[in-house]
Regions:
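N-terminal, cleavable Sec-dependent signal peptides of secreted/periplasmic/extracellular proteins
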Residues: 1-167
Length: 168
């Protein structure tokens, strides 16, 4: 009789989720995270992000159900997050940043969404398209031309938007 393979799940881990899907060198990014324990599920933690030469970049803490976020500007060197959980220190590598690309950032302000598309100076000056949809139905289309700027701002009124998940 074959035995089942042992679970390779670690005792404690943190997963990182850069807003917009990726980190880009030199572009400030919001990074969400989830901390989980094999035995407890989601857990509350706090920690510190360190850059090259162990320089402290930012601190972070969970907000709810093991999840939280922090703002971080990546470089060409990979950063690490250090946390203490149950009196034991853990170190996790943040995702590697791309040398060029785009970052999408969305913030909710009074009756509006503030959408920012950011790029670093080495990224191509492409014209991009931003599609906004709800339940697979297009709501809006916006062409983005950076010209010589690295940030494109698009305020979007929430009045008239349907309830539920809006996809960008």
């Amino acid at each position: 009789m074959k035995q089942r393979p042992r679970s390779k799940e670690k005792d404690f881990m943190i997963r990182f989720f850069p807003e917009g899907g990726q980190l880009v060198e030199g572009v400030p990014s919001v990074v969400a995270f989830e901390a989980t324990s094999k035995e407890e599920g989601t857990v509350g933690i706090s920690g510190t992000v360190y850059g090259p030469d162990d320089v402290e970049l930012t601190q972070f803490t969970t907000l709810h159900d093991g999840m939280g976020c922090f703002t971080y500007t990546p470089t060409d060197k990979q950063a690490k997050a250090v946390v203490t959980y149950q009196d034991k220190k853990y170190s996790f590598q943040l995702p590697k940043a791309l040398p060029h690309g785009y970052v999408l950032n969305v913030a909710s302000k009074e009756k509006a969404l503030v959408i920012k598309v950011l790029r670093n100076s080495t990224s191509l000056k492409d014209t991009l398209a931003l599609f906004i949809s709800h339940q697979g139905r297009p709501l809006m289309y916006q062409t983005i031309d950076f010209k010589d700027q690295t940030v494109y701002h698009l305020p979007l009124s929430t009045q008239g938007l349907p309830r539920g998940v809006i996809q960008l």
